[in-house]
């Protein structure tokens, strides 16, 4: 009995000894549960956070806390990470609040989720390129630019694409968009209206070589010039030099045997290519591609060649166009057997001496240059699926079909072997980049064309709607759970999270600052998406905004919003790659303002003047010089003249109309251009007319938003795009706001297809030329022009001019008080005033 009693006492003591520990862990669990349920952050909309589990080690005095996925959706900085740990220590009971606490989210301690660019110390070298660096010549270089870039994206190769595109739906035997027609657009069209006219030019202005797996040219015409077959009226020509003669390579090359192509047919296997040994002497032997251009306009120029064992890295191409001759160096040691983009140029209709491409055998290296087909213009879709082609311009199609036309292997553009075009198109964007980059320093484990792409960026828009006119905002996606957590160069896939964080942080800051709102930042998802899983390099998807939400698109249709988004993304990519390579960066300047062209006292000269634009968000984005581009008559713009200061004097030949635009440049690259101003000196001038361009407005389409109706009345007013846009699919048909979220004809925003493939004209910023040509035709009067900004600031005096011509265009606001006063004073002094515009009758002011 005594033994039994002693055993009972011992058992009781043991149980009572465990009670405090059990009670403590329950206490910890309850406090952590409450903390995460009530957790809120102003940084992002991340949904509901929860405690997943925790482990406590009293012996080693450690506490490991694991939060759910949502907690990892937010951005982490050194400041908010320290604040989170302070909060945990304050809420936890003793003695655990003195333990070493580690909080995990997204599979990492949260301090590891602080992007490298925000760390003052302790950089994660596993997600930096470090010594991994491409040191050769870029794939393509425009060497006619009158300035050099040293702290931009020079020699960087980036793959960028704009979401989806029209595709063949196998199970329904029809061509269709990948996303629904809503609010006058589709995702397939909308994101393209940011990527093509804004983002890609900004990256290229910073010096980057940009590849996009969808056709970038909105030109519906296409001309092929080749040594095998040519578009009718076009011509391929070769000139030999002594013993240096053009020969046929042993590899197959491009030939256009058909107008339409079935699946799994490669036009880059149907023809031949030519090669010749190089010489250091200039232009002794060359090949010429002379197109028969069907219609005057802008055309992209793509070249092609084969990469041969003796290929040189400085093949010299000359593009003759309406503005003159632009010279390129192409590294033929990479990227053979596909279309290689050089640039977009203006060409006159027909066959012209100033419309051709020339490849010289001049090189600083001993080897060979290779010549295959040259392509002018984007063209129409020509891939047959289900017995038919798409019937739309190629730029509207998905990447799968451009990949076939660009000579990609079948397994690259059709992983499903022709069974599922939808999946193939999604995969092709990444697989094309991998194929092009295979064998490069950034993708050494795959075979390919050795182009050193080091980043991919996919711009999408998302679904989702709000019924209270609130914003849905931006979401970022990356993938780490693939290939043992590494990209093909061996660095951590968490480098993609850094990129995603930088882009979302930049967007929230830039959009909020520019538009005076709080732009909605959503989550950062670490999920298994093809476009972030398959790329061999760091990659991200940006769901820019919701194409299903009126408030997002009302802002999203504004050209200024598109510019802001593109500039923000460009800046983030610039800073990200500078961090990855431990290099300095400079942000390219904003466009100049207060542009004016006046007559100089010296005979037959014009003075150009302007002022730089400060960027309050970017201290490095200061202009260090300028480039003045000149156009004569109906020609194109030349390659530009570098100017150090903010004025430039031009000698003019009487009888010719001169047009000018100015860009600002610095170590980081080149800004977007100014408005275009024109000037003319009559041979026997009776006086000078001043043309004042007051038409600077751009806007989205007309909108309506009341208790019952919501949407965009594109038919009434499509808005004023920057230059032009292809963003619209058709007119909105359903405006019933109670039907939000329905993606059929019964749903809010449902739209037609009347505008698909159309380029809607916008503000070209080139109207002084139009008015000036009329003045020239009238005879005996010269003219100069200026921005209305210079009249309002007082830097342009109206009194010396015989007449003032105010271009008010589609401006729908009242003339400013300063402008009204200047015009009043001019008229009171006997001046002659002509003013034109769409809203002049009710917008002149008091």
Language model features: what each stretch is:
Residues 797-799, 806-846:
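A glycine-rich, often tryptophan-bearing local segment used as a flexible ligand/cofactor-contacting loop or short
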Residues 272, 373-381, 461-483, 514-583:
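Active-site-adjacent mobile loop/cap segments within catalytic or ligand-binding domains
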Residues 161, 396-493, 525-548:
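Active-site microenvironments of hydrolase-like enzyme catalytic domains
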Residues 357-368:
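Short beta-strand-plus-loop segments that form exposed binding edges in beta-rich domains
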Residues 649-670:
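Beta-strand-rich modules
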Residues 66-68, 73-176, 357, 371-388, ...:
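Non-catalytic propeptide/linker segments at domain boundaries
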Residues 194, 198-206, 214, 386, ...:
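Aromatic-Pro/Gly-enriched surface loop or interdomain linker
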Residues 576-620, 654, 668-687:
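Pro/Thr/Ser/Gly-rich low-complexity, intrinsically disordered linker/stalk tracts
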């Amino acid at each position: 009995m005594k033994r039994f009693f002693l055993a009972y006492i011992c058992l009781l003591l043991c149980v009572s000894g465990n009670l405090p520990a059990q009670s403590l862990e329950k206490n910890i669990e309850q406090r952590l549960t409450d903390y995460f349920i009530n957790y809120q952050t102003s940084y992002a909309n991340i949904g509901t956070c929860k405690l997943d589990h925790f482990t406590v080690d009293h012996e080693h005095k450690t506490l490991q806390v694991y939060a759910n996925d949502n907690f990892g959706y937010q951005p982490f900085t050194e400041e908010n990470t320290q604040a989170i740990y302070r909060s945990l220590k304050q809420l936890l009971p003793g003695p655990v609040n003195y333990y070493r606490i580690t909080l995990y989210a997204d599979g990492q301690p949260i301090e590891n989720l602080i992007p490298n660019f925000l760390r003052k110390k302790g950089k994660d070298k596993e997600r930096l390129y470090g010594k991994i660096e491409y040191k050769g010549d870029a794939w393509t270089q425009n060497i006619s630019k009158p300035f050099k870039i040293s702290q931009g994206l020079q020699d960087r190769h980036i793959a960028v694409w704009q979401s989806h595109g029209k595709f063949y739906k196998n199970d329904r035997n029809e061509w269709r968009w990948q996303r629904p027609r809503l609010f006058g657009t589709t995702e397939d069209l909308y994101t393209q209206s940011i990527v093509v006219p804004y983002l890609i030019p900004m990256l290229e202005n910073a010096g980057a070589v940009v590849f996009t797996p969808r056709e970038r040219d909105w030109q519906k015409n296409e001309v092929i010039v080749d040594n095998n077959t040519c578009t009718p009226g076009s011509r391929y020509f070769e000139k030999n030099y002594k013993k240096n003669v053009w020969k046929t390579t042993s590899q197959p090359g491009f030939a256009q045997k058909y107008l339409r192509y079935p699946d799994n047919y490669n036009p880059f296997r149907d023809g031949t290519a030519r090669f010749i040994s190089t010489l250091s002497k200039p232009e002794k032997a060359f090949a010429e591609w002379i197109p028969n251009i069907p219609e005057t306009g802008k055309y992209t120029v793509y070249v092609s060649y084969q990469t041969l064992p003796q290929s040189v890295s400085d093949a010299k191409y000359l593009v003759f166009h309406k503005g003159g001759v632009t010279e390129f160096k192409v590294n033929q040691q990479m990227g053979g057997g596909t279309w290689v983009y050089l640039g977009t140029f203006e060409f006159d209709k027909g066959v012209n001496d100033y419309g051709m491409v020339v490849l010289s055998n001049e090189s600083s290296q001993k080897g060979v240059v290779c010549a295959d087909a040259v392509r002018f213009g984007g063209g129409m879709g020509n891939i047959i699926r289900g017995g038919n082609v798409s019937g739309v311009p190629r730029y509207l199609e998905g990447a799968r079909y451009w990949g076939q036309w660009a000579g990609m292997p079948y397994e690259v553009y059709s992983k499903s072997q022709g069974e599922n075009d939808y999946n193939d198109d999604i995969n092709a964007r990444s697989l094309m980049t991998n194929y092009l980059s295979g064998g490069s320093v950034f993708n050494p484990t795959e075979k390919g064309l050795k182009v050193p792409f080091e980043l991919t960026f996919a711009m999408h828009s998302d679904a989702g709607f709000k019924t209270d006119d609130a914003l849905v905002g931006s979401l970022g996606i990356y993938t780490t759970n693939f290939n043992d957590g590494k990209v093909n160069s061996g660095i951590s896939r968490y480098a993609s999270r850094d990129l995603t964080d930088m882009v979302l942080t930049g967007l929230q800051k830039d959009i909020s600052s520019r538009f005076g709102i709080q732009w909605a930042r959503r989550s950062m998802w670490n999920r298994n998406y093809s476009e972030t899983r398959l790329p061999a390099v760091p990659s991200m998807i940006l769901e820019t905004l919701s194409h299903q939400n009126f408030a997002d698109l009302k802002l999203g249709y504004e050209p200024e919003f598109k510019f802001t988004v593109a500039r923000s993304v460009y800046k983030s990519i610039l800073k990200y790659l500078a961090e990855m390579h431990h290099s300095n960066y400079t942000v390219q300047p904003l466009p100049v303002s207060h542009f004016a062209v006046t007559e100089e006292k010296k005979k037959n000269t014009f003075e150009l003047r302007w002022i730089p634009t400060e960027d309050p968000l970017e201290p490095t984005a200061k202009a260090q010089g300028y480039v003045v581009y000149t156009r004569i008559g109906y020609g194109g713009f030349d390659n530009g003249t570098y100017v150090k200061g903010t004025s430039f004097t031009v000698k003019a030949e009487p009888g010719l109309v001169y047009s000018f635009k100015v860009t600002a440049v610095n170590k980081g690259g080149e800004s977007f251009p100014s408005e275009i101003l024109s000037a003319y000196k009559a041979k026997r001038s009776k006086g000078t007319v001043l043309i004042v361009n007051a038409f600077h407005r751009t806007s989205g389409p007309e909108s309506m938003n009341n208790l019952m109706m919501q949407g965009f009345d594109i038919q009434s007013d499509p808005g004023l795009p920057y230059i032009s846009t292809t963003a619209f699919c058709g007119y909105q048909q359903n405006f019933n706001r109670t039907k939000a979220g329905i993606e059929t004809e019964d749903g809010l925003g449902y739209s037609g297809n009347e505008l698909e493939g159309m380029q809607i004209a916008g503000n070209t910023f080139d109207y002084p030329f139009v008015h000036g040509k009329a003045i020239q035709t009238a005879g005996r009067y010269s003219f100069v022009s200026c921005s209305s900004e210079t009249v309002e600031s007082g830097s342009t005096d109206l009194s010396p001019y015989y007449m003032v011509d105010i271009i008010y265009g589609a401006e729908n606001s009242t003339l400013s008080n300063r402008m009204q006063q200047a015009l009043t004073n001019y008229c009171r002094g006997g001046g002659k005033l002509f003013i034109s515009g769409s809203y002049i009758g009710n917008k002149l002011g008091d």
